[in-house]
Regions:
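Glycine-rich ThDP/TPP pyrophosphate-binding loop and its adjacent helix/strand module
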Residues: 73, 108-264, 268-277, 282-286, ...
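A glycine-rich helix N-cap at a beta->alpha junction
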Residues: 86-96, 161-175, 368-380
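Non-catalytic terminal/interface segments that mediate subunit docking, oligomerization
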Residues: 65, 248-357, 362-372, 465, ...
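Active-site nucleophile and cofactor-binding loops and adjacent substrate-binding regions
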Residues: 40-48, 68-72, 100-119, 142-146, ...
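Cofactor-binding active-site loop characterized by glycine-rich and histidine/acidic residues
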Residues: 41-162, 298, 303, 312-313
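N-terminal amphipathic, basic-rich helices that act as targeting or association modules
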Residues: 1-79, 204, 215
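Peripheral docking tails and interdomain loops at the edges
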Residues: 271-274, 385-387, 407, 527, ...
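Glycine/charged-rich beta-loop-alpha catalytic/anionic-binding loops adjacent to active sites
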Residues: 29-36, 95-111, 133-139, 312-324, ...
Length: 582
């Protein structure tokens, strides 16, 4: 096997064209084996094998710097830059992350996981090179829908003005995670259909040189193209037409489903661990489709992640014009939601917690200043969510709970969530966000009669004395377990409180606790600093009430073990009760 002898790009350069083609097959075989056992980004990597080989054949990494947008397609790059063992041998599968990582290799220049940043980052590297009067190529690799992100367009806009070497490889597989959206992709389609000759050319209009590679999965053609632009003295776009998922039939035929995969059976493609029950995604789509039929003003919005809201392809078709995918453009999604609300519509924007930060300004400026009554549903904002450092969902409580006018809610069950969502859509006074719990969805069948328009009214679910436990969202059930453990240890029944609201405190209830409680415990699923518990502690700051805040310490975690993280932050029932020293 050639791949076993590849310890760096210098070894790639030793191979003939035929050998490079065999190397591509070996890379795909290794990827198929690893991803079937380990999971990861499938389609993006299978489509970029030949381009990655060609880049490392032509350029001189790490002197020539390659920046992968999102970097979810960087697996072949890692295999060719000294990290092949992490893809060839199961005992080493966890040696590398799923994204570029400077801590792993000098061939990686940034830790990247969010979209549309590569061109701007590459511009910075190119400018630094020129300031130091050095030589070398800087290559930005962007695709999978990332061009629709505002930062990518901003980077393209400035690239022609840079005045030095910059190579932008546009990996055009006609897909985002799902299908692409927006006029930009119509232009890419026109360029594909005319072999790059269309008179309407976005890149040339921005002052960039341009070449087109029709066979973006053909090593020889890619090598020729990259040799043509190597050491260019200006900014140039190399537009390559690739096939997402190339080399695995199921991924070629079902590109959306195979963007990312869990462990699966290679022969059938079926996941090894199937889940047939409800989750918050499927429940969201089911509810919204029903609501859409009842009210034509209801509209669901996504920024290129439709399945997080449960809107798989058939449900998107069912929703029709009442479903909007703006592409990878969170800022536009949020501002558009604010505009729809201002115009009398009822928008619901579903977004991963980790991507909320990409639209923070729009939430503050466009949504909340005028109190436009849009609904935001944040998914996977939890220690039980994604655990890569680039995709943590632990910051949304401090970020969103401190924006004036925003009502941020934290349900603990399916029933509470749907009641909150229904109230939020039908009311027209407040911008509302709903933080979905992490872990498995709990459904207790209870009918929710709470009036959420009475803001910041907590609910005492178990009345006791001495110790009060306020469990927010995901950690409400842990709060119930803590209360039970307190009673078992002391014989005194503890009070349990479901706060519902993240953005405000129930001063009446908290004041009442002073009468017969000495200790208040808060539990929250996210960073402690600037979070929910600190608001409670601040309220009791001038009193004798002892307050224990539990959550996650603010730090950039990467690929953490959930149980270890909980123990590290004293987020276990035994540790919490022990801290009380009862």
């Amino acid at each position: 096997m050639y791949i076993e002898n590849i310890n760096g790009p210098e070894d790639v350069k030793k191979l003939s064209e035929d050998q490079l083609n065999v190397l591509a097959e070996e890379i795909r075989d290794a990827l198929l084996k690893k991803l079937s056992k380990h999971g990861g980004h499938f389609g993006p990597n299978f489509g970029m094998v030949e381009a990655t080989i060609a880049m490392h054949y032509v350029f001189e990494s790490p002197k020539d710097k390659i920046v992968y947008d999102v970097s979810h397609q960087s697996y072949p790059h890692k295999m060719l830059t000294g990290r092949k063992d992490a893809f060839l041998y199961e005992e080493h599968y966890d040696d590398v992350s799923g994204y570029s990582n400077p801590g792993e290799s000098e061939h990686d220049h940034f830790t990247i996981g969010h979209t549309s940043t590569s061109i701007s980052l590459a511009l910075g590297l190119a400018k630094a090179r020129d300031l130091k009067e050095e030589n070398g190529n800087v290559i930005a690799v962007i695709g999978d829908g990332s061009l629709s992100g505002g930062e990518a367009l901003e980077g393209l806009d400035y690239a022609a003005e840079l005045g030095g070497n910059l190579i932008i490889v546009v990996n055009d597989n006609d897909m985002s995670i799902a299908e692409n959206h927006g006029g930009l992709y119509e232009n890419l389609k026109a360029l594909r259909e005319t072999n790059g000759e269309s008179k309407c050319n976005l890149f040339k209009a921005m002052g960039l040189d341009y070449i087109y590679v029709k066979e973006g999965n053909k090593v020889a053609d890619l090598i020729e193209a990259f040799k043509q632009v190597k050491d260019t003295k200006k900014a140039v776009v190399v537009h390559i037409n690739t096939q997402k998922g190339k080399g695995y039939k199921l991924a070629e035929e079902h590109k959306e489903e195979w963007h990312y995969c869990a462990p699966f059976d290679v022969e059938t493609g079926n996941p090894l661990d199937s889940f047939d029950g409800e989750d918050f995604s499927s429940v969201t789509a089911q509810y919204l489709l029903k609501k859409m039929k009842e009210d034509k003003k209801v509209v669901a919005i996504t920024s290129a992640t439709p399945t997080v809201m449960g809107f798989i392809e058939d449900k998107r078709k069912e929703a029709g014009k009442q479903f909007i995918d703006v592409g990878i453009a969170e800022e536009t999604a949020m501002a558009m939601a604010a505009g729809i609300a201002a115009g009398g519509g009822k928008p619901v924007y579903g977004v991963y917690s980790t991507f909320v930060q990409r639209t923070y300004d729009q939430i503050t400026q466009d949504l909340c200043i005028d109190s436009n009554a849009a609904t935001i549903v944040t998914f996977w904002g939890s220690v039980y969510g994604m655990n890569d450092v680039t995709h943590l969902g632990l910051q949304d409580i401090p970020m969103m709970s401190n924006i004036p006018n925003l009502v941020y809610l934290a349900p603990t069950t399916k029933e509470e969530y749907l009641a909150m969502l229904d109230w939020s859509i039908d009311q027209d006074q407040y911008p509302v966000a709903i933080k979905l719990p992490g872990g498995e969805m709990i459904s207790d069948g209870k009918k929710i009669t709470k009036d959420f328009s009475q803001l910041n009214k907590y609910e005492v679910t178990e009345k006791g004395s001495k110790v009060a436990v306020i469990g927010l969202g995901t950690f409400y059930n842990m709060g119930c377990e803590v209360a039970k453990a307190v009673e078992e240890k002391t014989g005194t029944k503890a009070t349990v409180i479901n706060p519902y609201y993240i953005t405000g405190i129930d001063e009446v209830l908290l004041e009442d606790l002073k009468k017969d409680h000495d200790v208040v415990i808060t539990l929250e699923d996210g960073f402690l600093e600037g979070g929910f518990g600190e608001k409670i502690a601040r309220f009791y700051g001038d009193s004798d009430m002892k307050v224990f805040n539990y959550g996650v310490k603010k730090e950039l975690l990467d690929r953490y073990d959930i149980e270890e993280l909980l123990k590290k932050n004293h987020l276990t029932v035994q540790q919490i009760v022990g801290d009380l020293k009862l």
